[in-house]
């Protein structure tokens, strides 16, 4: 049984999963909308929402924390200066997942994840 299991492993090792989420987060921040599988989108949602909440503080330490997760100067700058200030009045719920299609090669359910 899968009851009370903590998180999605996405059939990857922990380092591979961490790299995948980092790259998906950078792509979402830079493009504000990406298409991926539903499982990856749901995992990315919790990852990116925690990052945006940290970025909303707006101070130097928050900037360092966000950069430690993303390791990308442009994505960090865009998140801190453009995206986070938009959500000052909003308490969570910064992303939207829209199911789109099944992928032809392996019939994986696909979805768009976008910043609200």
Swiss-Prot record:
SUPFAM superfamilies cross-referenced by the UniProt entry: Prokaryotic ribosomal protein L17 (SSF64263)
SS bonds (residue pairs): none
GO molecular function: structural constituent of ribosome
GO cellular component, one term: cytosolic large ribosomal subunit
Keywords: Ribonucleoprotein, Ribosomal protein
Gene3D superfamilies: Ribosomal protein L17
InterPro entries referenced in this protein's UniProt entry, alphabetically: Ribosomal_bL17 (IPR000456), Ribosomal_bL17_CS (IPR047859), Ribosomal_bL17_sf (IPR036373)
GO biological process terms held by the UniProt record: translation
Subunit composition and interactions: Part of the 50S ribosomal subunit. Contacts protein L32.
Family designation: Belongs to the bacterial ribosomal protein bL17 family.
Name the UniProt record assigns to this protein: Large ribosomal subunit protein bL17
Biological source species: Nitratiruptor sp. (strain SB155-2)
């Amino acid at each position: 049984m899968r009851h009370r299991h903590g998180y999605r492993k996405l059939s990857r090792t922990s380092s591979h999963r961490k790299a995948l989420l980092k790259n998906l987060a950078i792509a979402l921040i830079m493009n504000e909308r990406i298409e991926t599988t539903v499982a990856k989108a749901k995992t990315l949602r919790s990852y990116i929402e925690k990052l945006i909440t940290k970025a909303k503080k707006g101070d130097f330490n928050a900037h360092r924390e966000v950069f430690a997760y993303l390791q990308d100067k442009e994505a960090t700058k865009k998140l801190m200066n453009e995206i986070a200030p938009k959500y000052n009045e909003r308490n969570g719920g910064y992303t939207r997942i829209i199911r789109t299609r099944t992928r032809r090669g392996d019939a994986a359910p696909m979805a768009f994840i976008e910043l609200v």
